[in-house]
Amino acid sequence: MTRTAYVNGVYAPLRAAAVSIQDRGYQFGDAVYEVWAIRGGRLFDREAHFARLSRSLRELRIAEPMSGPALMAVIAETIRRNRVSDGIVYLQVSRGIAPRDHAFPSTLVRPCIVVTAKSLDRAILNERLATGVNIISLPETRWARRDIKSINLLANVLARQEAKEAGAFEAWFVDDDGFVTEGTSSNAWIVDASGRIRTRGLSNDILHGVTRAALLRIAHERQMQVIESPFTIAEALAAREAFISSAGNPAVAVIAIDDTPVCDGRPGPVTRALGAAYLGGAP
């Protein structure tokens, strides 16, 4: 089946879809993005992702490309045209097309929007949930506004490639004080030696993960002990469990860090319970 993309008001075959070479997203990374998981034909955490998109746009002073209902209609149509039941939707909004200049355009420009959707093999996620993943740790090298979901991801790309070359699935960044911030495309968690679920608190240091928020809500509803505080790699290795979360990988166990097993090297009960509750929940 030929995949279809939405670009600035037009649905086109993915291979033919294009943006201007003067698009500020292309030239400066002056753009934001969002990713929704689709499971069983449903968008998970739909409204929370829309809210984060709006926040990122406000932080960069980029205008909303269209109304919320209109944007939802575009997303739904993109999913329909690509016949996606299990997969992801990717949406990107740039400041628009303008002559190259680092400062914002002096005249009003229209934001550029791209929406794509693709199917993913659910069996791959199920296997990952069942077996867990290995990760590595690396020094934090990203900019200071990680709370904005910007397309500026070069440091993430380099770290993820280093993880891949090390035979790992993900990399956790570690700040100058020795605390884990997050992964290249996921939030970081542990269940510490006292049985408390821990994840770094919200600030400009990390992306305000939508799946992170959903898992915190589930944990509180189940009266699990939760604390939002940073932790070190040493604490993660001494923990009962460690895991990552993202739209595509909700509550996936980390079974080894830098080739050292976490606990017994298997997904733990808290991670499994949170993942099952999240995947069984409503969007």
Ranges and model annotations:
Residues 1-172, 176-179, 207, 216-283:
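Conserved alpha/beta cores of soluble small-molecule-handling proteins
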Residues 211-212:
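Secondary-structure junction motif
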Residues 172, 179-202, 208:
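Glycine- and Gly-Pro-enriched alpha-helical subdomains that act as flexible
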